[in-house]
Amino acid sequence: MRKNRAEKRDVLADPIYNSKLVTRAINKIMLDGKRGIAQSIIYDAFNIIKEKTNKEPIEVFNKAIENIKPHLELKVRRIGGANYQVPVEVSAERQITLALRWLINYARLRNEKVMTIKLANEIIDASNNIGGSVKKREDTHKMAEANKAFAHYRW
């Protein structure tokens, strides 16, 4: 067990869009430390978004993240030999973390051929409140609503 909690490191804003959120997306999409490939995937996806929507890609991306962010999640709590799924509020930092995780996971599951197209389409869908990642948020909220009776077990 740690003596102290590890300090959160601050990420640097990305060079093109000057956004920490884009840097976090790059870090999340990166595999085996290949940052260059991850950056090209994100930036190419943003170019596709610009072509398809004629809007600023960073605005579409931010709107998508806002639409995916969960406000409640379930945590399992063991009480008296029974496991309860207790709905808890999600901190702002964790909302962004979950939104990015879901966005990238559901982009990877799409049927298009190339990751840039998959990611661009998932971001566009999420900004329009459709797509797998938005469905995941809605399912999470539904489960939290269904288990509202156990909310008094919060800690």
Swiss-Prot record:
Q: Name one Pfam family in it.
A: Ribosomal_S7
InterPro entries for this protein: Ribosomal_uS7 (IPR000235), Ribosomal_uS7_bac/org-type (IPR005717), Ribosomal_uS7_CS (IPR020606), Ribosomal_uS7_dom (IPR023798), Ribosomal_uS7_dom_sf (IPR036823)
**What is the annotated role of this protein in its UniProt record?**
One of the primary rRNA binding proteins, it binds directly to 16S rRNA where it nucleates assembly of the head domain of the 30S subunit. Is located at the subunit interface close to the decoding center, probably blocks exit of the E-site tRNA.
Keyword Ribosomal protein listed: yes
Domain of life according to the entry: Bacteria
**What GO annotations for molecular function exist for this entry?**
rRNA binding; structural constituent of ribosome; tRNA binding
Q: Using the chain's own numbering, where are the disulfide bonds?
A: none
The name under which this protein is listed is Small ribosomal subunit protein uS7
- Subunit description: Part of the 30S ribosomal subunit. Contacts proteins S9 and S11.
Which Gene3D superfamilies does the annotation name?
Ribosomal protein S7 domain
This protein's GO CC annotations: small ribosomal subunit
Q: What is the lineage of its organism?
A: Bacteria, Bacillati, Mycoplasmatota, Mollicutes, Mycoplasmataceae
Question: Which PROSITE patterns does this entry report, sorted A to Z?
Answer: RIBOSOMAL_S7
Q: Which UniProt keywords apply?
A: Ribonucleoprotein, Ribosomal protein, RNA-binding, rRNA-binding, tRNA-binding
NCBIfam families attached to this UniProt entry: rpsG_bact (TIGR01029)
Q: Which GO terms describe its biological process?
A: translation
Whichever gene encodes this chain, its name is rpsG
UniProt lists the family membership as follows: Belongs to the universal ribosomal protein uS7 family.
